[in-house]
Amino acid sequence: MKIFKIDANTIATGTTDVGLRRSQNEDAFLIDSKIGLIALADGVGGRDAGEVASFEAINALQEYLAECHDKGAIRSKDNNPTLRQPVTASGLNSTSHLLDQTLAAVIHANDKVYTMNQDRGLPPDRSMGTTLIGLICAPDDPWSTVAFHVGDSRLYRLRDGQIEQLTRDDT
């Protein structure tokens, strides 16, 4: 297992396991230290292609945030890159911009899975689904971190030997 250094105060590592009850692993995770992203998606069991939904959601999230990071841009709701202020490292990584980027990226990931369901003609009771949870850390400011989650995957913090649950299940 590889350990990734995200910033001066954050390290991350990850693994998935099929567990004892399922025959197929429907989890996907990503650690991208360049853009400060740590994310996990857990495909919804009992529906079609949860493993595809989790993989595609993670990829869509990473692509969106990497594009924003590389261009120094925040996408608007109509997907056109737009600059909200002059391009500076500290300005682009402000908490306000992290919130905007993260919300837009999660919506983009959801739209990707929704579109795939529509393209496959899957009815709502069988459509692909996934949870999505993670953190994005501003590379220039270790105190600017945004957590996001949809579904019942949980986010925990380990600090001083104590584990604390940071999210409530969204089902």
Model segments located where?
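PP2C/PPM-type serine/threonine phosphatase catalytic domain
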Residues: 1-171
